[in-house]
């Protein structure tokens, strides 16, 4: 998962009994005018995901990244920004929501440093691309602000070596078409691999994490590099990251964290391994078994029902897509 698992678990435990049902009662965040042009795969899961982040709570949910990611995952079902509700579209098209005002920072801005949050900014660029959002001016503004943070060697100052953030910067820049900057940031990402082959939030750690390693693999695989030497180095790093994931798997079909099963990490690992050309059928079978009657994917802290935080990261791997293939339009 993207946020600290312990913190998310506490939040999720609090909201499970009221938050999910409230989101369903308050109304779906996707506009009613959505055209049924082609039936998506796993329609019940798509329906669950559409209602997971409602108009009523969307403004308070954008800062974590999960709402943005749920919209990214819906792009895999053919949803575009034009099919989102006005309240959700505003999160992509209103300056006061994106960057903020003199009274309140936007969701892409750190309230303490007043600078752009690099990982969330990358996710915004990626989401804007795959959702076909009509917000090119704001995308350009985000890229300009990100460029200031990117050093000559590709390091992203505000990320403080957080491989998750840097991976999303790569994906966002690549989505926006800034391939030269994306390649530079790839160089910095390669240097963040731990000795065990994994990547993590903190460069001072000695071990990798499942989800961060998986998003790093996808970021690295999303960018065509300019020469054979760079490509060889990237491929070597990816191979070590793949070996890390395979070694961390439990029972050859899922991952665990904090003493329990980790469906988010498993979902991410599926996408990372698939992006690297690995067979993920056993992992997909395990994740598919956690899909509940409401279409959502079950979380260990809320058994018997779908969880919006898990489903926000789990739909694409269930239908055989990754953040690399989605960006390529596949």
Regions found by a protein language model. Name each.
Residues 36-54, 80-108, 134-153, 178-192, ...:
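Extended, well-ordered alpha-helical scaffold segments
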Residues 1, 292-300:
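Short helix/strand-capping connector loops at secondary-structure junctions
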Residues 1-15:
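Bacterial Sec-dependent N-terminal signal peptides
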Residues 1-5, 24, 278:
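Non-Sec secretion/translocation targeting segments of pathogen effectors
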Residues 28-32, 150-157:
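Structural signature of transmembrane alpha-helix termini at the membrane-water interface
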Residues 55-82, 105-136, 156-184, 195-237, ...:
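An alpha-helical repeat/solenoid feature that recognizes helix-turn-helix modules
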Residues 16-34:
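C-terminal segment of classical bacterial N-terminal signal peptides
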């Amino acid at each position: 998962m993207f946020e600290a698992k312990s913190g998310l678990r506490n939040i999720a435990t609090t909201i499970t009994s009221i938050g999910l049902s409230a989101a369903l009662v308050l109304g779906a965040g996707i506009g009613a005018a959505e055209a049924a042009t082609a039936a998506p795969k796993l329609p019940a899961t798509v329906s669950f995901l559409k209602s997971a982040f409602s108009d009523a709570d969307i403004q308070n949910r954008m800062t974590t990244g999960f709402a943005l990611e749920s919209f990214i995952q819906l792009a895999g079902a053919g949803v575009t920004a034009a099919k989102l509700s006005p309240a959700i579209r505003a999160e992509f098209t209103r300056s006061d929501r994106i960057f903020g005002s003199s009274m309140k920072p936007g969701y892409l801005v750190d309230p303490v440093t007043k600078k752009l949050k690099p990982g969330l900014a990358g996710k915004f660029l990626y989401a804007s691309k795959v959702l076909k959002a009509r917000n090119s001016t704001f995308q350009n503004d985000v890229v300009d602000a990100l460029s200031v943070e990117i050093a000559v060697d590709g390091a992203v100052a505000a990320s403080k070596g957080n491989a998750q953030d840097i991976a999303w910067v790569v994906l966002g820049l690549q989505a926006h078409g800034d391939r030269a900057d994306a390649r530079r940031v790839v160089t910095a990402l390669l240097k963040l691999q731990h000795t065990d082959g994994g990547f993590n939030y903190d460069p001072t750690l000695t071990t990798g994490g499942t989800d961060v390693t998986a998003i790093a693999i996808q970021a690295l695989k999303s960018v065509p590099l300019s020469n054979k030497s760079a490509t060889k180095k990237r491929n070597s790093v990816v191979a070590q990251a793949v070996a890390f994931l395979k070694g961390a798997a439990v029972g050859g079909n899922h991952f665990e964290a904090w003493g329990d099963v980790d469906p988010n990490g498993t979902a991410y690992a599926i996408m990372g391994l698939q992006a690297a050309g690995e067979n993920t059928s056993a992992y997909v079978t395990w994740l598919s078994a956690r899909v509940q009657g409401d279409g959502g994917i079950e979380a260990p802290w809320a058994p018997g029902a779908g969880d919006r935080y898990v489903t926000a990261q789990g739909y694409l791997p269930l239908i055989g897509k990754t953040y690399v293939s989605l960006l390529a339009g596949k």
